Amino acid sequence: MRRITLVLIIGFVVALVGLIALSLWLVPQDTNPAFAVATDFSRAALRGHEADAAAVLSPELAAYVAENCPDGAVTACIGGYIPDDWGDLVDVVYRRSVLQDSGRAWDIQTFASFQHGQGFSGVCIYLRAENPTPANADGWKITRWAGWVSCDVENKGLDALRTDPDAPNHAP
């Protein structure tokens, strides 16, 4: 193989990898329907928008909320996790995720920032989104949560929050 051909092939591969990396960096992750459901749910729950938050709960999680949360409200459960001295929610963003069950579920970590005291380190939230038929983009439902704690605390990472049965604020 001629040297120029080898250089062209290597250049093409490097350019292709660079293009893929650039597109992954530029495309917002919450364009994935599961990630969008997770961030939208977190925002709605933290802002007290009960109807929006409850609309994306799985039937099993909705039953858990009805039985275990004050007034059977998901926003009351989640609002109870957040100290008043953190202030108002600034925003929630997607942080990372792990694909599960052959694409029918995602274990997702979102990151919330608050007006006072929890801006830089933030609040780490774990959510599991499931969709029995992934081809249906509207079918994603929240089936579990944990966290809603400062990212400064020990064991607040995605792996700990999704696998530890004693994770803080877990449901169910």
Give the label of every model feature segment:
Residues 62, 70-71, 117, 144:
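Residue-level signal for mature regions of secreted extracellular proteins and peptides
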Residues 86-172:
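Exposed beta-sheet edge and beta->alpha loop/turn motif
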Residues 64-69, 138-139:
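Boundary/linker segments of alpha-helical solenoid repeat arrays
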Residues 49-65:
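Short, well-ordered alpha-helical segments enriched in acidic and aromatic residues
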Residues 2-43, 47, 55:
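Short, low-complexity N-terminal intrinsically disordered segments enriched in polar/charged residues
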Residues 27-30, 62, 66:
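Alpha-helix initiation/capping motif
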Residues 71-95:
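Short, solvent-exposed helix-to-loop capping segments enriched in aromatics
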